[in-house]
Design a protein with these regions (language model features):
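Paired small-residue
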Residues: 74, 85-94, 283-291
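A late C-terminal transmembrane helix in Major Facilitator Superfamily
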Residues: 310-346, 352-353
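Conserved MFS/SLC helix-loop-helix module at the cytosolic interface between two early adjacent transmembrane helices
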Residues: 46-85
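Structural signature of the two symmetry-related core transmembrane helices
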Residues: 63-76, 259-274, 354
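C-terminal transmembrane helical hairpin of 12-TM major facilitator-type secondary transporters
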Residues: 259-303
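Helix-to-loop junctions at the C-terminal end of transmembrane segments
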Residues: 47-59, 245-257, 341
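Cytoplasmic helix-loop-helix junction between adjacent transmembrane helices
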Residues: 90-128
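Helix-loop-helix hairpin linking two adjacent transmembrane segments in secondary transporters
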Residues: 84-86, 115-117, 123-169
C-alpha cells in the first residue's frame, strides 16, 4: 500500500513540474493546465464522501484494487490526451482515486495490524507520501526532458500495475464489519464534540499550512533572493526532512497523540514568524524550512491515528470526512495565501499562517480532551 501511496501522490502532483510542455502540446495556457490540480481536488472531495455509502458490502480489498487500476487508467488517459478535455477527464479520475484511497486508509490500517501498531502503519503509509513529495517534481521534470511529458505520465502505468499485483497477492480479504453507512452518518458524526473540534482543527491546520507553503517559492525568490539551484536544494531539504519526520513520528505518538497534535502547529507558527524576521538569510531559510518539512509532513500521521482512536467503528466514514476537510482547506488556504501575498506582501501572509496554526493547536487540545490515555496539558 505504501507503493500505491507513492504512485498516487506522484500522479496527483506530476503536472506541477510539466506545466509548460503540457500547455504547449495541448494548446492552452499554463493556468488552464494548472486547473487540472483543482479538478482532481474537487473530485477527491466528492469521492471521499461517497466511497463508503456507495461501496456497500464490497470487499475492501477488491475496492482498493479497483482504485489502483483506476490510477493506472488515469495516467494512460493523460498521457494519450490529444485535447484539454481528455486531460481534465484523466485528472478527474486521479481525484477519485485520491479521495477513495485516503478515506479508507485508517480503516484498512486498523484491519491489517493490532491497535498498538496503527500509528506505525499510518507512518509507513505516509512515508510513500513523503517520498513522492521528495522526488516527484524533480523526477517528473527530468523524465519530461528525456522522454517527454507523455512518457512521464505513462511511467505511472507500470508502477500502478506493480502496486496492483502486490496488493492482490499480499492483502487479505476485508469485508465491511457492518452495513454500509448512509450520508446521514456524516451529520451524526458532528454531534460528537471531539469530532467537531477535530475536523475544525484539521481544517484550520491545513489552511494555515498552505497559506504559507504555497508561496514558499516566491518568498525565496523575492525576499531571500536565492538562485535556482539553491531554491531546488531548499525544496529538496524540505522533502527529505519530511520523509525523516514521517518515519520518526510514530515514536512520539506512542507517548501522546495530544501533545504531538498541539506542538506541531505551534512549532510551525514559530517557524512562520521566524521566516519573517530572518527573510534575507539563506542559512536561516535552509534551517527553518527544513524544520517546517520535518513537522508539517508528519502531522497527518497524528491526525489519522486520532481518527482511528476516536471513530474505531466509523473509520471509513470518518476518513471520508477528513479527506474532504483536508482537500477543501488546502484550496481555501492556497487561495487566501494568494490574495494576501499579492495584496499585502509576505509578512501579512506568514503572520496569518502563524495565527491560523495557533488556533489549530488550541482546537487540537479541545479535540483530544478527556482521553484518559493522554497526559493533561
Amino acid at each position: 500500500m505504501t507503493l500505491c501511496v507513492f504512485a498516487l501522490i506522484a500522479s496527483e502532483f506530476l503536472p506541477v513540474s510539466l506545466l509548460t510542455p503540457m500547455a504547449r502540446d495541448l494548446r492552452v495556457s499554463e493556468g488552464l493546465i494548472g486547473y487540472g490540480m483543482a479538478i482532481s481536488g474537487a473530485f477527491a472531495v466528492v469521492a471521499s464522501l461517497c466511497i463508503a455509502p456507495f461501496s456497500g458490502s464490497m470487499n475492501r480489498k477488491v475496492l482498493l484494487l479497483a482504485l489502483t487500476a483506476l490510477m493506472g487508467v488515469s495516467g494512460a488517459v493523460v498521457a494519450l490526451a490529444q485535447n484539454y478535455e481528455t486531460y481534465m477527464i484523466g485528472r478527474a479520475l486521479i481525484g477519485v482515486v485520491v479521495g477513495g484511497f485516503w478515506s479508507m486508509s485508517a480503516a484498512v490500517a486498523m484491519r491489517l495490524v493490532p491497535p498498538e501498531d496503527v500509528a506505525k502503519a499510518m507512518a509507513i503509509f505516509n512515508s510513500g507520501n513523503a517520498l513522492a513529495t521528495v522526488i516527484a517534481a524533480p523526477l517528473g521534470s527530468y523524465l519530461g526532458g528525456v522522454i517527454g511529458w507523455r512518457g512521464a505520465f505513462f511511467c505511472l502505468v507500470p508502477v500502478a500495475a506493480v502496486a496492483l499485483v502486490w496488493q492482490w497477492v499480499t492483502l487479505p480479504a476485508m469485508q465491511p464489519e457492518k452495513g454500509a453507512p448512509s450520508f446521514r452518518i456524516f451529520f451524526s458524526l458532528f454531534k460528537r464534540s471531539a469530532v467537531s473540534f477535530g475536523m475544525l482543527a484539521v481544517g484550520v491546520f491545513f489552511m494555515g499550512q498552505f497559506v504559507l507553503f504555497t508561496y514558499v517559492r516566491p518568498y525565496l525568490e523575492t525576499v531571500t533572493q536565492v538562485d535556482l539551484p539553491t531554491l531546488s536544494t531548499i525544496l529538496l531539504v524540505m522533502g527529505i526532512a519530511g520523509f525523516i519526520g514521517t518515519s520518526l513520528i510514530g515514536l512520539f505518538l506512542k507517548s501522546s497523540v495530544r501533545l504531538v497534535l498541539s506542538v506541531i502547529p505551534l512549532s510551525m507558527a514559530s517557524i512562520a514568524i521566524a521566516l519573517v524576521l530572518t527573510g534575507s538569510s539563506v542559512v536561516a531559510a535552509f534551517l527553518l524550512l527544513g524544520l517546517w518539512g520535518l513537522v508539517a509532513t508528519a502531522a497527518p500521521v497524528g491526525w489519522w491515528l486520532w481518527l482511528a482512536r476516536t471513530l474505531p467503528a466509523d473509520a471509513e466514514a470518518g476518513g471520508g470526512l477528513m479527506v474532504a476537510t483536508i482537500q477543501l482547506s488546502i484550496a481555501l488556504g492556497s487561495t487566501l495565501g494568494g490574495l494576501l501575498f499579492d495584496g499585502s506582501g509576505y509578512r501579512v501572509t506568514f503572520f496569518t499562517s502563524a495565527a491560523l496554526l495557533v488556533i489549530a493547536a488550541g482546537l487540537a487540545l479541545a479535540a483530544t480532551r478527556g482521553n484518559p490515555a493522554e497526559p493533561a496539558l
